[in-house]
């Protein structure tokens, strides 16, 4: 039988996971995949993150996947971290993200537009379920903002283990600089700490330094 693109990626990820790495770094694992296959890849990553406690860092342009599956998002711009935090925090900065060439999930843009008109308030929506609860009026905004955090065990609950940031970091960058021989700085004064059990998404426009950062994280560049 012929495997789909998503199934092939799932097999490749499983082969890597069999080695039980402490940190798994992926550079656009859903490139050229359709929506269903892309979701399959991120479901696989979340299962590994939750079941094995592996810290996962993934570069991805499909921001809806990052907002749904990651518990921390980093936004790169010209080799520097422009924004970082939980998805709800990062994707609330619609104008700032647009200015540096990064999109927000569509439902988040709709929510922010409605909030600007004074029609809704609370935590920005990141997926269709949250948007439906907020916009339809089935749940009032105050309750929707609480429910948007997703209870433990729900499919959209953050996968970060409790007190993970009290644990010893698995990887730390302290004011890292990197420049290629034929160009300027690809990464500039970048500080980053990764903790056990995190699932971190990295996003940024072309040339922001995403691939360089992943190579630095994996030791392919020094």
Predicted regions and their residues:
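Catalytic Walker B motif of ABC-type/P-loop ATPase nucleotide-binding domains
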Residues: 24-27
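The feature captures the beta-strand-to-loop junction immediately N-terminal to the Walker
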Residues: 203-205
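Conserved catalytic motifs of ABC-family nucleotide-binding domains
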Residues: 20
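ABC ATPase "signature
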Residues: 84-85
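Conserved ABC ATPase "signature" C-loop
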Residues: 78-79
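Helix-to-loop junction immediately C-terminal to a conserved catalytic motif
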Residues: 218
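Conserved ABC ATPase signature
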Residues: 1-3
């Amino acid at each position: 039988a012929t495997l789909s693109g998503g199934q092939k990626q799932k097999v490749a990820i499983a082969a890597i996971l069999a080695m039980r790495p402490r940190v798994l770094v992926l550079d656009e694992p859903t490139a050229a995949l359709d929506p269903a296959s892309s979701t399959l890849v991120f479901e696989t990553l979340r299962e590994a993150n939750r079941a094995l406690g592996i810290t996962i860092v993934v570069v991805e342009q499909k921001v809806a996947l990052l907002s749904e599956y990651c518990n921390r998002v980093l936004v790169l711009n010209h080799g520097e971290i422009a924004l970082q935090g939980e998805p709800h925090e990062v994707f609330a900065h619609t104008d700032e993200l647009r200015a540096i060439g990064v999109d927000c999930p569509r439902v988040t843009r709709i929510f922010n537009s409605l909030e600007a008109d004074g029609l809704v308030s609370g935590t920005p929506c990141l997926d269709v379920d949250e948007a439906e609860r907020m916009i339809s009026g089935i749940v009032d905004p105050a309750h929707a903002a609480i429910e948007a955090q997703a209870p433990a065990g729900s499919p959209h609950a953050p996968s970060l283990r409790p007190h993970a940031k009290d644990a010893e970091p698995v990887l730390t960058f302290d004011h890292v600089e990197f420049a290629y021989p034929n160009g300027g700085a690809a990464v500039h004064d970048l500080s980053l700490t990764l903790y056990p059990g995190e699932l971190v998404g990295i996003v940024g426009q072309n040339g922001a330094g995403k691939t360089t950062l992943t190579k630095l994280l994996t030791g392919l560049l020094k």
